[in-house]
Design a protein with these regions (language model features):
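Conserved donor-nucleotide/metal-binding helix-loop-beta segment in metal-dependent transferases, i.e.
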Residues: 111-138
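Conserved N-terminal catalytic core of the sugar/cofactor nucleotidyltransferase
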Residues: 2-6, 28, 32-101, 107, ...
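Glycine-rich phosphate-binding loop at the start of an alpha helix
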Residues: 36, 83, 87, 270, ...
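Glycine-rich hexapeptide-repeat left-handed beta-helix
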Residues: 315-458
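Hydrophobic/aromatic residue at the end of a short beta strand that borders the catalytic acidic motif
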Residues: 101, 106-108, 172, 354, ...
C-alpha cells in the first residue's frame, strides 16, 4: 500500500488538560510530535502519500507539515466520528486500498508490517491491528472478540466477553466503502445496559461487514504500541518509547563539539549532541540521550533511559528519575527532583519534587512538591468526562497543563490536574482538579501582637 490516511480531526476531550491547547497528534513523545513518529513509520514501510483529515487545531499540523511534499490535508470539519472522516479523506483519492491510522496512536514500522502481511495474505475487506487487553478494563475501549487471525465480534466498551481492543490502525479495501456509508451514526454493537453516544465509529462499520458475512482480519500489535487517549497514556507512551529507543543502544555516540568531563561517572551509553556538556561530578546511571546545546553539570544525577532535549540546563545536584523526558529549553536547577515528562521551556529553578507531566512553559516556584504516596497506599480514582477510572500507571502523578505557574511551597496532592493558563499561589495545597484560566491562592488569617526587648526583662 502506497497511501495512508491519518485521522487528526478530533478534539481529544479525554486528554485534558493537554488536549485543551493542542491537537492530540501534536503531543510530544521523546521530544517530537507524535505525528512525526507516525510519518516516519509509514515512510519506512514504503508509503508515499499521507493524507491528514483535520479539523480541531489543524493550524498546528499545517505549520509543522505543510512543506512536506508527501503530506496532503483534507478538512473533516463537521464529521461526527471516524467513519465520516475517513469517507471525506477517501473521496479525494483514487486508491483501491489504503492504510488508515488514528492520529493518537504511537506505533512502529514492525506493527505496520505485521498488519500488511496478514492483509495481503488474506485480502479481506479490512484487517485491524489489535492489542490484548491484559489488565485494562474493556469498558474503557472499543473491543473485539478474536479467533485466530480474524475478528468474530465488535463490541463498544463492554463489561466482558472480549479479549482484545482496537489499536487504531487498519488496512482497508474499497469494498469497505458501502459499510462505511451504512454506518448508523452510533455504535449499535453494545451489551444490554450500556449506552453509546451519537458518534459514527469506523468499528461499527466493521461489525456491519461481519454481519454481512465478510471476514475481518485481526493482526497483533507489539507491546510498544500506545493509544494516547488520556493524560496518563502520554506518560506511559514516553516511558515506553524511551525504553524502545535507548535500551537497544550498543555504544556511545558523541558529537565532535560535545564535552564529557573525566570526573563524571557514567554507567551506560550516552548519545550527546553538538555543543552539549556533561560536567564534573555528574552521575549517569544508564543509557541517556542528550540533545544539542545542553548542559548537565555540577553534580546532576540522571537515572537510566532519560532523554534531555536541546538547549537545556540541568545543574547543581538536580535529579532526573528513570525514564523521564525533558523537553527543549528546560531549566532544572539546585536540588530539584523531577520524574515524568516536561514539555518545552519548563523551569524548575531550584528545590522541589515533581512527578507527572508539566505542560509547555510551566514555571514551578521554589519548593513546589507533589504528593504521590497516599496514606492508604492506594491509587487515585480519576474523573474523565464523567467516567471514574483508576489508571494502571500514573494514578498518583500530577498533571499540569500548558502555561501553569506555581508559587513557592505549593503542594500538589496525588492525581491532581491543573488546567492551562492557571496559577497556584504560594503555600496553596491543591487536592482537586483546577479548571483552566484559574487563580488559586491562600487567604491567610494573621494575628499581630507587639513585641520587643521588654519581653526579655529590659
Amino acid at each position: 500500500m502506497k497511501t495512508a490516511v491519518i485521522l487528526c480531526a478530533g478534539q481529544g476531550r479525554k486528554m485534558w488538560p493537554y488536549g485543551a491547547t493542542r491537537n492530540k497528534a501534536m503531543l510530544p513523545v521523546a521530544n517530537r510530535p507524535l505525528i512525526l513518529w507516525q510519518v516516519d513509520a509509514l515512510t519506512t514501510i514504503g508509503v508515499e502519500k499521507i493524507v491528514l483529515a483535520v479539523d480541531y487545531r489543524q493550524e498546528q499540523l499545517r505549520s509543522l507539515l505543510d512543506h512536506d511534499p508527501r503530506i496532503a490535508f483534507v478538512s473533516a470539519g463537521g464529521c461526527n466520528g471516524t467513519a465520516p472522516a475517513l469517507l471525506a479523506a477517501w473521496s479525494t483519492l483514487q486508491d483501491p486500498s489504503l492504510l488508515l491510522c488514528y492520529g493518537d496512536i504511537l506505533y512502529t514500522a514492525e506493527d505496520l508490517r505485521a498488519l500488511l502481511r496478514l492483509h495481503q495474505e488474506r485480502r479481506r475487506p479490512a484487517t485491524a491491528l489489535l492489542q490484548p487487553l491484559g489488565e485494562e478494563k474493556p469498558n474503557e475501549w472499543l473491543c473485539a472478540q478474536v479467533s485466530g487471525d480474524r475478528i468474530e465480534q465488535v463490541l463498544g466498551h463492554p463489561r466482558d466477553s472480549v479479549s482484545h481492543r482496537f489499536a487504531g490502525v487498519f488496512a482497508l479495501e474499497k469494498s469497505m466503502l458501502p459499510f462505511l456509508r451504512a454506518n448508523p451514526g452510533r455504535m449499535e454493537a453494545i451489551q444490554v445496559g450500556m449506552m453509546a453516544p451519537d458518534e459514527a465509529h469506523l468499528e461499527a462499520s466493521l461489525q456491519i461487514a461481519l454481519e454481512a458475512d465478510h471476514e475481518i482480519g485481526a493482526a497483533q500489535a507489539g507491546a510498544t504500541l500506545q493509544d494516547l487517549d488520556k493524560p496518563w497514556h502520554l506518560l506511559q507512551a514516553n516511558y515506553a518509547w524511551g525504553r524502545h529507543l535507548l535500551q537497544s543502544m550498543e555504544r556511545s555516540n558523541m558529537a565532535d563539539t560535545a564535552k564529557i568531563s573525566k570526573r563524571a561517572t557514567i554507567n551506560g551509553y550516552v548519545l550527546i549532541g553538538a555543543n552539549s556538556e556533561i560536567g564534573d561530578g555528574v552521575i549517569i546511571e544508564g543509557n541517556v540521550w542528550i540533545g544539542k546545546n545542553s548542559r548537565v553539570v555540577q553534580g546532576a544525577i540522571l537515572e537510566k533511559n532519560v532523554i534531555i532535549g536541546d538547549h537545556c540546563t540541568v545543574r547543581r545536584y538536580a535529579q532526573i528519575e528513570e525514564g523521564s523526558v525533558i523537553g527543549d529549553r528546560c531549566f532544572i536547577g539546585h536540588c530539584a527532583e523531577v520524574a515524568g515528562v516536561l514539555m518545552r521551556n519548563v523551569y524548575a529553578y531550584h528545590y522541589g519534587e515533581y512527578w507527572g507531566i508539566l505542560g509547555e512553559a510551566c514555571d514551578l516556584g521554589a519548593a513546589t512538591v507533589c504528593g504521590n504516596l497516599r496514606f492508604d497506599d492506594g491509587q487515585t480514582v480519576h474523573q474523565v468526562c464523567g467516567h471514574r477510572e483508576t489508571p494502571l500507571l500514573g494514578a498518583n502523578a500530577a498533571y499540569l497543563g500548558d502555561y501553569v505557574r506555581t508559587g513557592v511551597n505549593a503542594i500538589l496532592m496525588p492525581g491532581v490536574k491543573v488546567g492551562p493558563y492557571s496559577v497556584i499561589g504560594a503555600g496553596a495545597l491543591v487536592n482537586e482538579q483546577v479548571p483552566e484560566r484559574t487563580l488559586v491562592y491562600v487567604q491567610q488569617q494573621q494575628i499581630r501582637k507587639t513585641w520587643g526587648p521588654e519581653r526579655y526583662g529590659w
